[in-house]
């Protein structure tokens, strides 16, 4: 290894008068040496640089293509999610409207049912009151009739004698006989 570096050092010490050689002293470089170095770099580095740039370009294009595919997939998923959201919102609105309608219908049914029940109870109450009034009236009539009958019997028994009683009976029998003849 030492001989290799020594050979480069010897190259740097060649006489520079009228000959072509490499100047290894960076501070003492001239335009010719620089152009040779740049020429070698461009000639050999061009292919490597082109390959690097082509690879980089291909990776960037692949990344862009993948990003576009992912974007399209994301857009499709977003559209699907929005469609599902609209569908769910529509169904929720329908459930809400149907729920409110059902609640209103049940409320009206309950009110109507309660009204009918109250009406029936009112009718039963009125019928019961009417029945109790009739029964009370009949009881009062029966008592009044019994008292009047007892009073009349008492009056008749005290006022009528046997002879008057027999004449009244005979007159009534005569009236019944006359009525029978008229109807025949």
From Swiss-Prot:
Its main location: plastid. Pfam families: ATP-synt_B. GO terms for cellular component: chloroplast thylakoid membrane; proton-transporting ATP synthase complex. It is found in: Plastid, Chloroplast thylakoid membrane. Keywords: ATP synthesis, CF(0), Chloroplast, Hydrogen ion transport, Ion transport, Membrane, Plastid, Thylakoid, Transmembrane, Transmembrane helix, Transport. One of its GO terms (molecular function) is proton-transporting ATP synthase activity, rotational mechanism. The keyword Transmembrane helix applies. It is a single-pass membrane protein. The chain crosses the membrane at residues 27-49. The keyword Membrane applies. InterPro entries: ATP_synth_b/b'su_bac/chlpt (IPR002146). In plastids the F-type ATPase is also known as CF(1)CF(0). F-type ATPases have 2 components, F(1) - the catalytic core - and F(0) - the membrane proton channel. F(1) has five subunits: alpha(3), beta(3), gamma(1), delta(1), epsilon(1). F(0) has four main subunits: a(1), b(1), b'(1) and c(10-14). The alpha and beta chains form an alternating ring which encloses part of the gamma chain. F(1) is attached to F(0) by a central stalk formed by the gamma and epsilon chains, while a peripheral stalk is formed by the delta, b and b' chains. F(1)F(0) ATP synthase produces ATP from ADP in the presence of a proton or sodium gradient. F-type ATPases consist of two structural domains, F(1) containing the extramembraneous catalytic core and F(0) containing the membrane proton channel, linked together by a central stalk and a peripheral stalk. During catalysis, ATP synthesis in the catalytic domain of F(1) is coupled via a rotary mechanism of the central stalk subunits to proton translocation. Component of the F(0) channel, it forms part of the peripheral stalk, linking F(1) to F(0). Belongs to the ATPase B chain family. This is ATP synthase subunit b, chloroplastic. It comes from Olimarabidopsis pumila. The gene is atpF.
